[in-house]
């Protein structure tokens, strides 16, 4: 066989193999992943991984890759992981020919920080399976490409594989990312697992493979907003009050779910969060994201109820199964005001959901030795979990699905009574998604979403200055209660000690707020007040994700099953010159259940960046508001009408004429029955 690669490539892995790294004790490791490969598939997976390796080392590395595939279900290329701790260093410590190339390296390494990543050695940032890329060969090669990237080139990355550098121009994206995009017939978990094991598909979740994760802070503000608005809408709490004296119960203290306790505390509630993995509880307790920890149901309940009675906030981490907790609370007649779940139910059979009666360690062992038996136990626990929620609902508890596919997992396990129509999931479920009931109408329909930024200097003073600038802007543009909530959030953000990893901030803002803050920050960079900044957002946004069980669950015109909004948003951000953009399959809710995209935008203080911001920031938000308006969402229609007036002669969004329901029903009865 003729190998043309060596002479034809100048950007490649080093010829000499790195020394096999040491694995530090005390860090979580991913369980064995499911794949069900044939012998031919296994050979293909090894052959695929060897594409990154010089032929002189194929015999040695083929054996290592085969061992990894057997033990872990995936080829991670552990030998190629850099020795020691990875973290997002100050931007000046990175090599690169353009600022974007260096900035993106900061964000990649931040995703793999031991203090942030769920399974750092397996490149999993959060969400049980959300990876930066598939393996450490890809990581090293991406870094090499970013070091060579110029401001007239674009790096293309497909499911973690750096396809190459291609000539573009200064106003084009520097990196274009896609993760796990599959042809429809094969777009399911089984086929994805095979593709991932073969080394051709990466599950990027949202900001894991999109290189924009900022630690659990990234979801705290959204969870805070959700809890606060749930209290207003469902418990009758006035807009100027918080959740003092209320009890919130949920499950999960991982990369995203870890925000629950902190958000509940900031919102003033007493809370109990169940988590089976004690190491995750340890992480959140050390970081100050939960205030108490215990393996005793009695103690957890007493702490929470004592705080609730005094109207004081608390976040109690209960080390145990959520179903055990619910049984105990129910049998002891404890009233729960708000209830949810943030276990990784987008992959319930891959370790995302732990069956009742198993410890976390037993769960991991059973996944490896008896995956079929594990599946049976998961289904049994899901059924019981659902039964307990129904019992609490009868007592007046408000339960909402937090978009983790919990209700879909219950349905997939064989429970049809969870469906609104009693048969299938086309009309949704009897319990609402938090987007359907709360976040959609209260925030997304207005354009409010999870805007974020990272100070690339890693200097806390830069973050403080941007916090103050944001607070000043919002205070001067206080139009409705959402603005006041956001003002209080950013005003107190530093006090609430939210930073884990690089100096980043999450702040819900609407289209104009995002654009104006972005322009202000770029001006501050230009004036030398702060160092470079990178902007982004969660894919979980008004226009970033099409997901009928979550982000688009409050779209009621039938288009909730369409994936065109997220795709158009991604393409539009590319056309307008965002620094890097990403489009993924299955973020949050699982493969085949979502198409989601995001971006990163580097602020270097230039007028070029100002131009891009003025074009891209309104688009990135308003594409979602426009779609929601066309679905006849009232708040979105109001927002679009205001936008059309504001941008008259520049932008114009189509709005719906409203038809009378009675007329449509009458015509159907008269002419179509």
Language-model features, listed with the residues they occupy:
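Small-residue-enriched alpha-helical segments and adjacent helix-cap loops
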Residues: 538-568
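Glycine-rich beta-alpha junction loops
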Residues: 278, 320-323, 342-347, 403-409, ...
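Glycine-rich, charged/polar anion/phosphate-binding loops
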Residues: 323-326, 385-386, 517-521, 565-568
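Residue-level detector of anion-binding/catalytic polar loops
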Residues: 270, 335, 398
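Catalytic or ion-translocation cores adjacent to nucleophile or general acid/base/metal-coordination motifs
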Residues: 205-228, 232, 239, 244-247, ...
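Long, compositionally biased, glycine/small-hydrophobic-enriched stretches that function as flexible linkers
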Residues: 1-216, 371-520, 524-536, 542-546, ...
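Short, solvent-exposed amphipathic alpha-helical segments in soluble enzyme
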Residues: 265-267, 330-334, 415-419, 525, ...
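Active-site/ligand-binding-proximal alpha/beta "capping" segment
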Residues: 315-343, 350
């Amino acid at each position: 066989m003729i190998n043309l690669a060596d002479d034809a490539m100048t950007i490649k892995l080093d010829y000499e193999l790195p020394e096999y790294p040491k694995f530090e004790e005390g860090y979580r490791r991913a369980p064995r992943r499911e794949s069900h490969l044939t012998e031919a598939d296994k050979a293909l997976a090894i052959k695929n991984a060897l594409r990154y390796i010089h032929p002189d080392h194929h015999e040695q590395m083929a054996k290592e890759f085969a061992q990894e595939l057997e033990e872990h279900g995936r080829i991670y290329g552990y030998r190629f992981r850099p020795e020691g701790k990875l973290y997002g260093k100050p931007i000046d410590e990175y090599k690169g020919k353009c600022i974007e190339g260096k900035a993106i390296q900061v964000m990649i390494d931040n995703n793999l920080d031991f203090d942030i990543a769920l399974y750092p050695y397996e490149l999993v940032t959060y969400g049980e399976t959300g990876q930066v890329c598939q393996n450490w060969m890809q990581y090293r090669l991406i870094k090499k490409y970013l070091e060579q990237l110029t401001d007239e080139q674009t790096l293309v990355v497909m499911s973690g594989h750096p396809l190459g550098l291609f000539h573009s121009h200064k106003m084009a994206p520097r990196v274009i990312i896609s993760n796990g995009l599959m042809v429809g017939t094969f777009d399911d978990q089984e086929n994805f697992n095979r593709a991932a094991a073969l080394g051709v598909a990466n599950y990027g979740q949202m900001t894991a493979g999109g290189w924009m994760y900022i630690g659990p802070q990234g979801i705290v503000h959204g969870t805070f907003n959700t809890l606060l608005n749930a209290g207003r809408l469902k418990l009758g709490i006035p807009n100027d009050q918080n959740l003092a004296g209320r009890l919130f119960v949920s499950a999960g203290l991982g990369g995203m779910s870890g925000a629950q306790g902190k958000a509940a505390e900031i919102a003033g509630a007493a809370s109990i969060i169940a988590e089976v993995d004690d190491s995750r509880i340890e992480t959140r307790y050390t970081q100050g994201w939960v205030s108490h920890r215990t393996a005793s149901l009695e103690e957890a309940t007493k702490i929470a109820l004592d705080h609730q009675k005094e109207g004081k906030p608390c976040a109690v981490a209960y080390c145990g199964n959520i179903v055990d907790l619910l049984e105990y609370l129910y049998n002891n007649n404890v009233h729960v005001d708000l209830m949810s779940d943030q276990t990784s139910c987008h992959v319930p059979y891959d370790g995302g959901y732990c069956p009742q009666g198993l410890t976390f360690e037993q769960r991991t062992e059973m996944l490896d030795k008896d995956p079929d038996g594990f599946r049976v136990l998961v289904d049994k626990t899901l059924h019981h979990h659902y039964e307990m929620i129904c019992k609490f609902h009868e007592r007046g508890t408000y339960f909402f699905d937090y978009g983790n596919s919990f209700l879909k997992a219950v349905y997939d396990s064989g429970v049809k009574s969870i469906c609104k129509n009693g048969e299938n999931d086309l009309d949704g479920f009897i319990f609402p998604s938090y987007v359907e009931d709360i976040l959609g109408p209260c925030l997304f329909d207005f354009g409010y979403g999870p805007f974020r930024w990272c100070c690339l200097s890693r200097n806390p003073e830069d973050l403080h200055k941007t916090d103050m600038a944001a607070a000043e802007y919002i205070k001067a543009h206080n139009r409705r209660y959402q603005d006041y909530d956001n003002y209080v959030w950013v005003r107190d953000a530093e006090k609430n000690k939210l930073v884990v990893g690089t100096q980043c901030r999450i702040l819900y803002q609407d289209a104009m707020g995002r654009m104006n803050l972005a322009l202000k920050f770029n001006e501050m960079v230009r004036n030398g007040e702060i160092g470079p900044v990178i902007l982004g957002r969660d894919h979980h946004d008004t226009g970033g994700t099409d997901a009928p069980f979550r982000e688009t669950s409050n779209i009621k015109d039938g288009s909730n099953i369409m994936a065109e909004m997220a795709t158009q948003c991604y393409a539009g951000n590319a056309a307008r010159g965002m620094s890097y953009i990403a489009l993924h399959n299955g973020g949050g809710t699982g493969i085949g259940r979502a198409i989601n995209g995001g971006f990163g935008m580097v602020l270097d203080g230039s007028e070029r960046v100002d131009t891009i911001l003025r074009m891209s920031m309104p688009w990135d938000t308003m594409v979602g508001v426009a779609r929601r308006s066309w679905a006849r969402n009232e708040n979105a229609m109001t927002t679009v009408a205001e936008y059309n007036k504001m941008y008259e002669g520049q932008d114009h969004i189509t709005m719906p004429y409203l038809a009378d329901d009675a007329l449509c029903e009458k015509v159907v009865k008269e002419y179509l029955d």
